Amino acid sequence: MSRDLQNHLLFETATEVANRVGGIYSVLKSKAPITVAQYKDHYHLIGPLNKATYQNEVDILDWKKPEAFSDEMRPVQHALQTMESRGVHFVYGRWLIEGAPKVILFDLDSVRGYSNEWKGDLWSLVGIPSPENDFETNDAILLGYTVAWFLGEVAHLDSQHAIVAHFHEWLAGVALPLCRKRRIDVVTIFTTHATLLGRYLCASGSFDFYNCLESVDVDHEAGRFGIYHRYCIERAAAHSADVFTTVSQITAFEAEHLLKRKPDGILPNGLNVIKFQAFHEFQNLHALKKEKINDFVRGHFHGCFDFDLDNTLYFFIAGRYEYKNKGADMFIEALARLNYRLKVSGSKKTVVAFIVMPAKNNSFTVEALKGQAEVRALENTVHEVTTSIGKRIFDHAIRYPHNGLTTELPTDLGELLKSSDKVMLKRRILALRRPEGQLPPIVTHNMVDDANDLILNKIRQVQLFNSPSDRVKMIFHPEFLNANNPILGLDYDEFVRGCHLGVFPSYYEPWGYTPAECTVMGVPSITTNVSGFGAYMEDLIETNQAKDYGIYIVDRRFKAPDESVEQLVDYMEEFVKKTRRQRINQRNRTERLSDLLDWKRMGLEYVKARQLALRRGYPDQFRELVGEELNDSNMDALAGGKKLKVARPLSVPGSPRDLRSNSTVYMTPGDLGTLQEVNNADDYFSLGVNPAADDDDDGPYADDS
């Protein structure tokens, strides 16, 4: 059957569509504007319905109205009608994000009656077991069968357009073997953002993951961790897809050995850089947000506030509470060693290190709330007193020439301060005192399991207790930040802007949005060569020059653990020793890397993946369309096997590599390669790309009534 490859339909499926759970939500949300600009109403996102949150995420549309769909998209409407007639419930609308993509959210409870039938069918088709009490897997099966049902209906009703179905992670991957087995006329892409087995092996802490991958007995290890059935779904999805991709080179290496299929290419995660852009204002924003953090620090350390905030640096680590995978253990150990170095050297600088990772807690401690309240009370009292003093000076000055007074303006504090002012101030100051021997707390919340918390126990082990002699102070904030926080009223993005350095020494990080977000906000960061972001930036910037751009890359792959910790300490100490002018210059260089992470650049890799899927699904049509025989062994080969080469920069510190240059041997990001902006529009054969998209002023609701 001949289908239109250029005007194909795109359906993207994930469990985090309009459902904030983890990083995939951020990927889909930030990528939506460029995808909608490219596909218009040919693009739909599909996911499960979260009844608790969907009303805040989706603008519901009346899909039954004839005008809800264009004539080209009428098969989607008919497919939904067919499924509704069979008892399937769903929500159809627009996701309330930039770009406003159309979404279909299936209510899995409405198809739960098919559960046993579908689980039995999955076993008979591909031999994947499904334990009764694994609710996450059961929901993955329900979603997979529902999506395959929907795609089958659309493919049957629409014989005109090619259909590309893109699935993210194993939770959305059950539909892939079903599409293959049922011979549904769609081409498929599967992207793994992290492998199941990889997460478990790294979190165990007893496995040299990256150097022993080739020797892993995957079936045995999956069984040992009790995830064999999930692993089978993930592996079946990888092998059933027309195109298999990962988010980074390091994850591609992992997937090749754990899922037993070499990925066809890399789909690195981008950012909507416009959201973060502040142009020349970003330095001012740093100063403003830093002052907010200063206010918190004054309250947190009240009674022991013996360090100069102008000589204080704010470091932080943030993310999910994965103690080893996110590198929290290494961060705390390195801070203890940094503290020792700074004390021995007699440094006057202080480092306040924040750990922002959600853990079970019972809200804020009374001490944390009281400290902020006492400092605010002192601030208000000082403001009242200074206002009164100003009024007295003004009254004296304005009477002076008329009453024949010969005395000068009062300068003695005793004359300016009334006794009542002194009493108020003394009360506020005494309220800031701590009981003798009591130190500022290291945690801001009442922890549910304080005695067994890994982060707190590590802090206790290295004895970073916020003593006056410590040059490194610790603050563990076991909740994500938001502007309504009563002690640190900043959103996460604002907090990042106010900090000086983000530290993310992850051991298992397929991509790593936290250092990427730091980069686009002009905040230097420390990452590792086993994180996708770290490896990506290592390839983009000349050897040993990444840190000049505020990207410090710790070697956690080829160095022993203790050597990696020492390297991290070296980087942090080097940063502490910088002057303010050096830090400002470095932030300027860091912010200039933003364009390297923009979806306008990264999104081209998604275009390549879709082309490769269409090439493999419709080889004859594709050859006829392109006019030549193309190699479809992987994404890079399909695009002509172009080498990405860059010239050695003439400036010092080196500039980011010019991806259009042709004079050296570097390729990005690594052996699997990407094209990014090297290719021109002709290289993409205009498959589904609307060249006028950037000039289109119509809003996302232009076709809605």
Swiss-Prot record:
InterPro entries: Glycogen_synth. Residues 686-705 are annotated as: Disordered. Phosphorylated by the cyclin-CDK PCL10-PHO85. Phosphorylation causes inactivation of enzyme. The keyword Glycosyltransferase applies. It catalyses: [(1->4)-alpha-D-glucosyl](n) + UDP-alpha-D-glucose = [(1->4)-alpha-D-glucosyl](n+1) + UDP + H(+). Its main location: cytoplasm. GO terms for cellular component: cytoplasm; cytosol; glycogen granule; nucleus. Belongs to the glycosyltransferase 3 family. Glycogen synthase participates in the glycogen biosynthetic process along with glycogenin and glycogen branching enzyme. Extends the primer composed of a few glucose units formed by glycogenin by adding new glucose units to it. In this context, glycogen synthase transfers the glycosyl residue from UDP-Glc to the non-reducing end of alpha-1,4-glucan. This is Glycogen [starch] synthase isoform 2. The lineage of its organism: Eukaryota, Fungi, Dikarya, Ascomycota, Saccharomycotina.
